[in-house]
């Protein structure tokens, strides 16, 4: 074989090998898709900072001067108070009297002595509480919240003893139908006193017994536990001061053992002198908790208009002292309405 022939044979063989290996002018396969690049998450827009809400400044506590001015304004200007003028009023706490005043024509003053009628009831309740060391018996409660059934009391005579008063006319009559039901009256306390060591006492003896136990200086014009005291606003205020100061056991019993009093809304009530209010009665005192008009104060209004009270929180006491020319239970109720206006003005430090 010539050189030319060898060269051609070699080229032919190389071409065949290249074709067999997929080399000559053909494609080597599809181009792979590029790896996707992740889209970055959007940067969150920051929320604006909340606008701070300013804390309201605390309401300043009224000063004693502000409270006194407000109470004086109510005493002289509130319609309920104008209706019962003239009178003397005072408000205090455990430290003593804080404010007072007299309104109306020829009004009484702090030292004016007067009959206080049913304001005597709180005094006897306090006496029994003190004698019992603050732990009343069930029998005590039965008499002192006026559900005992002794409901025919009329009056005592000045020269009687507790026992002879209790036996006088219908005073000691027991009405079985009223037992367990509220009936406002003096027979409950007179019977209780007669049965508990006070039977032989006349006015002076009764005053001595009550005052020795309570640290007070009351006088009695008749031996009636529920209505026989005559005294001044100053003397009664001192008694109330001892209550709110925690010196008398009755303080812890204010509002204790309450009974409903309004016959229109309570089947266990026969008679209440406060028409139109659903208050309660406790140990010788009212709880002024009528849902519509009550403020929860504890009080013992008297028939001639003398009205002592202790605030619901037992921190403040007050007296409205007057002596109506015509006695009647509604005089006490009228004073109670005025007393509420004075009490509210004192608490708020403003009137109206």
Predicted stretch roles:
Residues 22-26:
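Bacterial signal peptide processing site
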Residues 67-114, 286, 307-311, 315-322:
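A short, well-structured edge-of-sheet supersecondary motif
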Residues 1-10:
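Bacterial N-terminal signal peptides that target proteins for export
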Residues 60-69, 294-352:
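Structured C-terminal helix/loop/strand segments within mature extracytoplasmic catalytic/sensor domains
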Residues 112-135, 191-196, 315:
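Active-site SXXK
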Residues 259-320:
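Active-site Gly/Thr loop motif
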Residues 18-20:
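C-terminal motif of bacterial Sec signal peptides marking the signal peptidase cleavage site
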Residues 64-72, 137-249, 257:
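Active-site-adjacent helix/loop patches that line small-molecule binding or acyl-intermediate pockets
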């Amino acid at each position: 074989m010539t050189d030319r022939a060898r060269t051609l044979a070699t080229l032919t063989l190389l071409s065949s090998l290249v074709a067999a290996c997929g080399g000559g002018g053909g494609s080597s396969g599809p181009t792979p898709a590029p790896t996707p690049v992740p889209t970055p998450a959007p940067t969150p827009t920051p929320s604006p900072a909340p606008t701070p809400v300013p804390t309201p400044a605390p309401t300043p506590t009224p000063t004693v001067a502000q409270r006194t001015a407000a109470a004086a304004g109510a005493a002289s200007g509130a319609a309920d108070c104008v209706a019962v003028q003239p009178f003397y009023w005072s408000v205090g706490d455990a430290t003593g009297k804080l404010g007072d005043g007299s309104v109306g024509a020829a009004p009484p003053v702090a030292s004016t002595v007067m009959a206080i009628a049913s304001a005597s009831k709180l005094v006897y309740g306090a006496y029994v509480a003190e004698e019992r060391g603050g732990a009343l018996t069930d029998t005590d409660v039965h008499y002192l919240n006026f559900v005992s059934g002794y409901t025919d009391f009329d009056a005592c005579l000045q020269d009687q003893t507790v026992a002879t008063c209790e036996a006088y006319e219908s005073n000691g009559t027991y009405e079985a139908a009223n037992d367990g039901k509220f009936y406002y009256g003096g027979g409950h306390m007179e019977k209780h006193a007669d049965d508990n060591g006070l039977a032989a006492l006349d006015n002076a003896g009764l005053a001595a017994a009550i005052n020795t136990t309570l640290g007070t200086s009351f006088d009695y014009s008749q031996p009636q536990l529920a209505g026989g005291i005559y005294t001044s606003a100053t003397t009664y205020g001192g008694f109330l001061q001892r209550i709110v100061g925690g010196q008398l056991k009755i303080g812890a019993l204010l509002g204790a053992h309450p009974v409903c009093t309004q016959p229109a809304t309570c089947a266990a009530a026969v008679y209440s002198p406060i028409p139109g209010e659903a208050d309660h009665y406790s140990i010788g005192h009212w709880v002024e908790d009528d849902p519509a008009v009550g403020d929860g104060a504890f009080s013992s209004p008297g028939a001639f208009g003398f009205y002592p009270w202790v605030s619901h929180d037992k921190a403040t006491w007050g007296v409205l002292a007057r002596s109506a020319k015509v006695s009647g239970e509604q005089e006490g109720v009228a004073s109670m309405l005025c007393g509420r206006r004075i009490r509210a003005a004192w608490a708020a430090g403003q009137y109206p």
